[in-house]
Amino acid sequence: MATMAAEPVFVDTNVLVYAHVAEAPWHQEAQEAIADHEAAGAPLWISRQVLREYMVSLTRPQQFPIPPELTTVVAQVQQFQQRFHVANEGPEVTTRLLALLLEVPTRGRRIHDANIVATMLVYGVRRLLTNNTDDFVRFAAFIEVIPLVPPPASEPPPSA
């Protein structure tokens, strides 16, 4: 009997940062989520955009009380390129991004999110692991958003 391979998962920048910075919120959750998808055999994807955003986040002085050394960040990015499938942003991604912007009107910094979705679509990845679920709700017709931290259960209504 043949088994189906787990569907690929795209890892958003915030999850990558949380997983690799011990002081970050949701550090343990991010590490476990990545490990769980790996254990299930899901190919894990990132993009060149995610690599750039990771470097920006970790080297911004105001981000962490003691920012990591640049050599550490560079070494981590080199490791990510070995550990994850890395999607390149060629002309196909730009073409898909432009079409996506017309399908789901998006402006300003949200275009970065649209670019991630366009990259995913070009590479056939339909699942996104992120802690910024609200940023991707508008693209629900195209991708499945997997929340890093499930939303809290709604509180029961007060009794009368």
Please annotate each region the language model reported.
Residues 1-46, 62-75, 138-139, 153-160:
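Short, well-structured N-terminal submotif of metal-dependent ribonuclease cores
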Residues 1-4, 8, 114-160:
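Acidic, PIN/NYN-like endoribonuclease modules and their adjacent C-terminal/linker elements
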Residues 3, 85-131:
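Active-site neighborhoods of divalent-metal-dependent phosphate/nucleic-acid chemistry enzymes
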Residues 15, 50, 93, 115-116, ...:
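Alpha-helix capping/helix-boundary segments
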Residues 36-37, 80, 100, 104:
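Hydrophobic helix-cap positions at the C-terminus of alpha-helices
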Residues 40-41, 80-83, 142:
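Structured helix-beta-strand junction loops
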Residues 45-48, 130:
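Short beta-strand segments at enzyme active-site cores
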Residues 56-88:
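Helix-adjacent hinge/juxtasegments
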